């Protein structure tokens, strides 16, 4: 999967857009890597102070592209002929890519604004928890079905999502795999604002992007000193960095253990075949 994101520079604002509408903006490992590179590219632009991340279509992101998940390894061998049950495969794919995309989000130096043009699921839901501001449409919901899929929390969810959503609601989302609708996301402070004027029209994603950009211009515009914005964010986030570094590693190695068990692969295959349907 390549070419699933775009980046546009608009003065002090960079706009990253996920554009894989055919798959409800689901991303495979390479799609998430591409997104991480967009984030890192924007980070190098001194003229940019605000990064807006949004998507095209009716979903922000359906999470991982389940059609790319492989069959569970059994007695696989690595390149050296060592029987490792597929461990090297998962270290080079799941572990490496998840460490990378999560670090790209929690270390992003610009003011990160996320525009949820629709539902956000799985790893994508975890990652947006690192945003400084989140705006949403009425059709938005958050779903982290890790326990339903035989996984554990990933993408920093065990720290960032819990902090942003609150322990009680985060337990419902992470442990129960419960869908959290837009009104509850607003009540908990996970999102800063829901644009209720959007009524579900086909081009709502375009209108929503315009509304979010207008909000950025109004609330984070030239009347604020850009270097001060960046400096304040760095001070706010600095105490958390060491915690996030540790939790990121703990999550991916716990996830590695789950993949070595073969359970998540079987659950993903059930989803891909239609045998199992989650409450999307």
Swiss-Prot record:
Location within or outside the cell: Cytoplasm, Cytosol; Peroxisome
Recorded coiled-coil stretches: none
Catalysed reactions, as listed in the record: a (3E,5Z)-dienoyl-CoA = a (2E,4E)-(5,6-saturated)-dienoyl-CoA
GO molecular function, one term: delta(3)-delta(2)-enoyl-CoA isomerase activity
Induction: Expression is regulated by the transcription factor MSN2.
GO BP term, example: fatty acid beta-oxidation
Pathway(s) the chain acts in: Lipid metabolism; fatty acid beta-oxidation
Pfam families (alphabetical): ECH_1
Motif segment (Peroxisome targeting signal (PTS1)): 278-280
Keywords of this entry: Cytoplasm, Isomerase, Peroxisome, Virulence
GO cellular component, one term: peroxisomal matrix
Active site annotation, chain numbering: 154 (proton donor/acceptor)
Residues passing through the membrane, by range: none
Disruption phenotype: Leads to reduced virulence with smaller lesions with restricted growth of infectious hyphae and fewer blast lesions and green islands on barley leaves. Does not affect vegetative growth, conidium production, and appressorium formation but shows defects in long-chain (oleate and olive oil) fatty acids oxidation. Results in fewer peroxisomes, more lipid droplets, and higher levels of phosphatidylglycerol, phosphatidylinositol, diacylglycerol, triacylglycerol and free fatty acids.
Keyword set includes Mitochondrion: no
Gene3D superfamilies to which the protein is assigned, alphabetical: 2-enoyl-CoA Hydratase, Chain A, domain 1 (3.90.226.10)
EC number per UniProt: 5.3.3.21
Role according to the record: Peroxisomal di-isomerase that is involved in fatty acid metabolism enzyme by converting 3,5-dienoyl-CoAs to the corresponding 2,4-dienoyl-CoAs. Involved in fatty acid beta-oxidation, which is important for lipid droplets degradation and infectious growth.
Similarity comment: family membership: Belongs to the enoyl-CoA hydratase/isomerase family.
Protein name: Delta(3,5)-Delta(2,4)-dienoyl-CoA isomerase
Species per Swiss-Prot/TrEMBL record: Pyricularia oryzae (strain 70-15 / ATCC MYA-4617 / FGSC 8958) (Rice blast fungus)
């Amino acid at each position: 999967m390549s070419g699933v994101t775009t980046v546009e520079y608009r003065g002090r604002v960079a706009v990253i857009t996920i554009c894989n509408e055919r798959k409800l903006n689901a991303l495979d490992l390479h799609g998430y890597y591409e997104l991480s590179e967009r984030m890192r590219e924007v980070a190098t632009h001194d003229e940019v102070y605000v990064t807006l991340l949004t998507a095209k279509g009716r979903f922000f992101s359906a999470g991982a592209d389940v059609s790319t998940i492989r069959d569970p390894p059994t007695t696989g061998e690595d390149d050296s002929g060592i029987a490792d049950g597929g461990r090297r495969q998962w270290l080079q794919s799941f572990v490496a890519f998840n460490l990378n995309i999560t670090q790209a989000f929690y270390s992003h130096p610009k003011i990160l604004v996320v525009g949820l043009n629709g539902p956000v699921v799985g790893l994508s839901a975890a990652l947006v928890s690192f945003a400084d501001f989140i705006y949403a449409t009425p059709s938005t919901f958050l779903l982290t079905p890790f326990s339903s899929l035989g996984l554990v929390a990933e993408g920093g969810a065990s720290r960032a999502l819990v902090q942003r959503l609150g322990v009680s609601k985060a337990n419902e989302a992470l442990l129960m795999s419960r869908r959290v609708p837009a009104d509850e996301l607003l009540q908990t402070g996970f999102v800063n604002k829901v644009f209720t004027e959007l009524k579900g029209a086909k081009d709502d994603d375009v209108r929503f992007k315009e509304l979010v950009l207008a909000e950025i211009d109004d609330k984070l515009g030239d009347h604020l000193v850009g270097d001060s914005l960046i400096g304040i964010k760095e001070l706010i986030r600095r105490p958390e960095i060491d915690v996030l570094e540790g939790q990121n590693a703990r999550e991916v190695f716990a996830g590695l253990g789950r993949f070595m068990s073969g359970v998540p692969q079987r659950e993903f295959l059930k989803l891909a075949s239609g045998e199992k349907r989650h409450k999307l």
